[in-house]
Design a protein with these regions (language model features):
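Low-complexity, intrinsically disordered short segments enriched for Gly/Pro and polybasic residues
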Residues: 1-3, 221
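Redox-cofactor-proximal catalytic regions of oxidoreductases
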Residues: 63-89, 278
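Intrinsic-disorder-associated, low-complexity terminal segments enriched in Asp/Asn/His/Tyr and depleted
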Residues: 3-8, 17
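Short, basic/glycine-rich phosphate-binding loops at helix/coil junctions
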Residues: 83-90, 254-255, 328
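Flavin (primarily FAD) cofactor-binding/catalytic cores of flavoenzymes
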Residues: 18-36, 41-68, 98-374
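A short acidic, glycine-rich active-site loop
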Residues: 93-95
Length: 374
């Protein structure tokens, strides 16, 4: 790790300005940042660079979600060279590897110390309301009054479980990615993984390799290879400007914000984890879960169309990469363009699955997350 930021204080977490405290009343400060994960810490750096007095209020510890709400084998989807925060960049021995969760925690914890972030941990924000020309922030440890509030509490606080989960037979265990740690915590027997984005495909792969038969329910998804023409797909998307697209450059911002995460996994082998890879090891592929009636899960018949659309969009991305490589003189430096086999779909994917016959013992809801502003 390398940092180029010199904090005002010696190495260690920052302290609040004593002048911000009003004896016997609310604490006063310019800006309150809610959350001390990587986003909140990055905001702290930027505020400090501009001389803005602030405090970070954290309900637990720094990087709490990484410490308590991630499964054991998870690695970042992005290579180490992309792991950077304002004033801190990765400078380890393997820029093309992918951080494990302990490494992410260490990275974020170290960053908090490097920038001397003024953090108040074990502080739960209970309400935020407008007061005059500022805000009042109530917590379990007192009240703050401030000019500005930054909500950096994350976008993955609550697992989005569809309402149809209430119709699942009581004999079947249900878990979300926030609860899941490893296959050993699951019951023996078949597992239905609902959702085929990054989380769903990774968990389907891990659970199936543990010896539990897995059925994967896939709706709309984003397929991309881990490596293309000898370089990581993230390198290509960074170089071509795909990652630089602004919110005001898209036709439908709401749709853009709800595009599924790509089917990617971070591994030392840099292998592609798409639906073909999963069916190749024996995972059963079915369509989007549409409902549950009388103990039977009902699936959409649009699996083939969804897979064809994902293949089409992937090839459009690869075309963009090929054009950029040619225009920038890289064709002689990297392997030639190629295309991947289309997603293999059974002639007649099943449209129903009996949840009462004992074949399915667990359902994993890999159906996304949502923020919690309550």
């Amino acid at each position: 790790l390398r940092h180029n930021y010199q904090p005002d204080q010696c190495h260690g977490r920052g302290q609040l300005n004593r002048q911000s405290v009003v004896s016997g009343g609310p604490l006063k400060i310019d800006t309150v940042v809610i959350g001390a994960g990587h986003s909140g810490l990055a905001m702290s750096y930027c505020l400090r660079e501009r001389g803005v007095e602030h405090v970070l209020l954290e309900r637990s510890d720094v990087a709490n979600s990484w410490k308590t709400e991630r499964w054991d084998s998870l690695r970042l989807l992005t290579p180490n060279w992309q792991s950077r925060l304002p004033g801190l960049t990765y400078e380890g021995d393997d820029p093309d590897d992918f951080m494990t969760i302990p490494e992410v925690i260490s990275f974020v914890d170290h960053y908090a110390d490097v920038i001397s972030a003024p953090i108040q941990t074990r502080t739960t924000v209970t309400s935020v309301c407008c007061v005059g020309d500022g805000y009042q922030v109530d917590t379990n440890r007192g009240t703050w009054k401030c000019r500005a509030v930054v909500v950096a509490s994350g976008a993955c606080n609550i697992a989005s479980v569809p309402a149809i989960a209430s119709s699942v037979p009581s004999s079947i265990a249900m878990v979300t990615p926030l609860d899941y740690r490893n296959p050993e915590q699951l019951k023996e027997g078949g597992v239905l993984v609902v959702g085929a984005s990054a989380t769903g495909t990774q968990l389907a792969d891990e659970i199936h390799r543990s010896g539990r038969p897995v059925t994967l329910s896939a709706g709309e998804h984003v397929r991309i290879p881990r490596v293309y023409r000898g370089r990581d797909i993230q390198w290509w998307m960074d170089a071509t400007g795909v990652l630089d697209e602004r919110y005001d450059e898209v036709d439908d911002i709401n749709r853009a914000r709800n595009v599924p995460s790509p089917q990617l996994a971070g591994s030392q082998e840099r292998s592609t984890l798409d639906l073909n890879a999963l069916t190749g090891i024996g995972v059963k592929l079915i369509g989007r879960l549409a409902g549950i009636r009388d103990g039977t899960a009902q699936f959409s018949g649009s699996l083939r169309n969804n897979c064809a659309l994902a293949d089409l969009k992937m090839n459009r991305l690869l075309n963009t990469i090929d054009e950029w490589a040619s225009e920038n003189g890289l064709d002689d430096q990297v392997p030639s363009p190629h295309r991947f086999a289309g997603t293999a779909v059974a002639d007649s994917p099943p449209l129903g699955l009996d949840l009462t016959d004992g074949q399915i013992q667990t359902i994993v809801w890999a159906t996304g997350y949502r923020p919690d502003y309550s």
